[in-house]
């Protein structure tokens, strides 16, 4: 019973350490003018590659006619593993068909730069084949790897939601400024129109007085 409790305490401690180390990993900030790519090396075939991205800061209004960004993942062999079209943010996950350098590219069809918060993780959990090959690899290490991947999934979701929240705040601020500019412009237009009306009325009265004198 005591040994079981000790194991639980060890796993809890390991979980806290892993969670702290994972939380220290920050998302990449990529500015996409035309096309920008990020490379990540996958050590083992069959590893799970996952991540997310969100367009955080943009200089133009994302209306219904905005095409969004294109996202493409290319394998070391040059094959397209995954692609997303016309999006302002999404999640992705796939099994690596082989080990090697993978390329993650963003394409911006507009000339206006877009800032993207990009997060990627390569997860590896040893399987029975790995245990058979490596006699020093025990089931405890496998459990630790599984725990790490579970925590990584939670942290990735937190980072995705945080990036979306940042984008919403930026959009709200941009909308607020746009409303203020529109309101100020409307007041200026109304003041100018009123001024022109006053001048026009005064001109009519001056013509009427001159006619009566004649």
Swiss-Prot record:
Disulfide pattern: none
Motif Required for the export from the endoplasmic reticulum to the Golgi positions after renumbering to this chain? 213-214
Q: Which residues lie on this side of the membrane: Cytoplasmic?
A: 200-214
Q: InterPro entries, per this entry? A: Emp24-like, GOLD_dom, GOLD_dom_sf
Stretches assigned to the GOLD domain: 35-122
* GO terms under cellular component: endoplasmic reticulum; Golgi apparatus; Golgi cisterna membrane; plant-type vacuole
Q: Which family is this sequence assigned to? A: Belongs to the EMP24/GP25L family.
Q: What is its main location?
A: Golgi
Recorded protein name is Transmembrane emp24 domain-containing protein p24beta3
Q: How does it sit in the membrane?
A: Single-pass type I membrane protein
> What does the domain comment read?
The cytoplasmic C-terminal domain contains an Arg-Val motif, which is involved in the anterograde ER-to-Golgi transport of the protein.
Annotated GO biological processes are: protein transport; vesicle-mediated transport
Positions the record marks as coiled coil are 140-158
**How would you summarize the oligomeric state and partners of this protein?**
Probably oligomerizes with other members of the EMP24/GP25L family. Associates with the COPI vesicle coat (coatomer). Associates with the COPII vesicle coat (coatomer).
Keyword Thylakoid in annotation: no
């Amino acid at each position: 019973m005591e040994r079981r409790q000790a194991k639980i305490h060890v796993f809890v401690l390991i979980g806290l350490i892993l969670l702290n180390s994972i939380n220290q990993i920050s998302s990449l900030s990529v500015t996409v003018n035309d096309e920008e790519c990020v490379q990540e090396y996958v050590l083992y075939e069959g590893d799970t590659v996952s991540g997310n991205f969100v367009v955080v800061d943009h200089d133009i209004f994302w209306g219904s006619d905005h095409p969004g960004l294109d996202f493409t993942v290319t394998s070391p062999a040059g094959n397209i593993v995954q692609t997303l079209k016309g999006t302002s943010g999404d999640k992705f996950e796939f099994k690596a068909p082989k080990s090697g350098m993978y390329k993650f590219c963003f394409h911006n069809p507009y000339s206006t730069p877009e800032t993207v918060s990009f997060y990627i993780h390569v997860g590896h959990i040893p399987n029975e084949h790995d245990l058979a090959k490596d006699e020093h690899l025990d089931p405890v290490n496998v459990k630790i790897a599984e725990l790490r991947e579970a925590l990584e999934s939670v942290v990735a979701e937190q980072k995705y939601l945080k990036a979306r929240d940042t984008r919403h705040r930026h959009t709200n601020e941009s909308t607020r400024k746009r409303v203020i500019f529109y309101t100020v412009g409307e007041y200026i237009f109304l003041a100018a129109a009123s001024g022109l009306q006053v001048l026009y009325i005064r001109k009519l009265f001056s013509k009427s007085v001159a006619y009566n004198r004649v």
